Amino acid sequence: MRLCSVLAALLLISFSAHALVSPQSQSLSHGASRLEIVLEKKDKESWQAVDPGKVFLQNDLLRFRVTANFSGYLYVLNHGTSGDYTLLFPRAETGQENRIEANRSTNVPATEGSFRISGPAGHEVVYWLVSPVELSSEKIQSEYIPLPPPPKERKTPPKLIPRCDDKIFRARGDCIDMSAGPQGVADDSLPDNLAAIPAVSSRELLFERGQSASVVSAAEASGKPVIFEFRISHR
């Protein structure tokens, strides 16, 4: 996947989204933490919400719209089908301000840019992370470390061929890959820079998906980061 008009090869990254209890973020101790992700595709001059499992084509332009019921700092990293790891957000081309405010939508990229589908067919693996403190800040609590750069070693993800769900295709004519979208991630499959961050187990997260939005939630605030992945299926 390419960052339209800026990067030669930009891959989506997996990021963990989570509310941590700290003076710099809203406490969720009185309610469940909830993160809604809307995947949007550019259609001519407008953006349209699409099914998270939609199978995209080469050169399709995408972006995410994120809304949480908590405040924190958002980090997004991509493991592309070519094997490269790339930090998608924050960075100069996609927006340096990565603080998200409770109940306020944030676009990724936060600039006027977009992500362009490219590379071998398969699944882009996007990792999400929301921290109560800025990971590059000197004020980080002792148990947290600045987010290291993505691994330089190319590691081609398992080959997953995009497949249309026959029932959905017959019902509404859309090619939807039910293995795409948000899901938990095993600790041993995380890139090194994310594996070093103590996080809530994916088993403690709930994943819901609809035709135009996905929701990742936790029943209780745990005081730890949460890491999950969002798979983008394309031909």
Predicted regions and their residues:
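Bacterial N-terminal signal peptides
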Residues: 6-15
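Secretory-pathway glycoprotein ectodomains that are cysteine- and/or Ser/Thr/Pro-rich
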Residues: 17-73, 77-235
